[in-house]
Amino acid sequence: MSVRKKVSTPSKTSYPYYILACVVMLCVGLGITYFFLQNNVASAQEYPVKGFDVSHHQGDIQWQSISPQEFKFVYLKATEGGDFKDRKFQDNWLKAREQGFLVGAYHFYRLCRDGQIQAQNFIETVPKKTDSLPPVIDLEYDSTCINTYTREQLLKEIQVMHDQLYQHYGLQPIFYTSKAFYNIVLVDEFKQTPLWIREYQGQPELKGNPKWTFWQHTSQGQIKGIPTLVDLNVFQGSEQDWISFLERQGLYQLPQNLPIK
């Protein structure tokens, strides 16, 4: 038989100390968070080639207020899953290109949906243009689907979409992903596919140390002309490395202002 112990409660005079301790712990926590965020900003500033990505969540963007010289690349959300189309994609696509931005499109991949259907949704939505950046497949952790399907099943469907986009656009697709998803699903696979890593609290280092191409280092960016906070990204390498990357995509010899299409 267990004995119910008497629970002691702090005296009234000790409450100020508890409050003080809580305040100190909160300040320490905030300080650590601030340190990591500032460290990320400092690290990202080492890379000269900057860009951003947007979707309908950013609302009406004043593209004429943003400089293509400051932001060398822009990615726009186009589709999600098998049938969702971003309502701002066409407008953003036309206006960003009109202002001379180098533009690409991305698809938010749904792990529980068929890869072929998702590829078709993207292909029906995103124009095939020789002056566009490679297509991006956004792969993110989904506990329900990851626990429903085996790693092999997930990789098979991702491969289907990857291959269909490669065949249609003639450019090697890029995988946008997090450390968690990469380390669980993608590690040691798709070794020729460029990686775009989301990492806000440290360096974009992955299991096996694969080279990354883009790094989304914050979701709290501010850009004049965009009414909300926005994701900011950098390209790994110098400006000459960026030119070499564009040359491999057949994109370097572009006019200053791209035609409206």
Question: Which residue stretches match the model-derived regions?
Answer:
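Glycine-rich, charge-decorated loop segments at or immediately adjacent to ligand/cofactor-binding or catalytic sites
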Residues: 115, 181-188
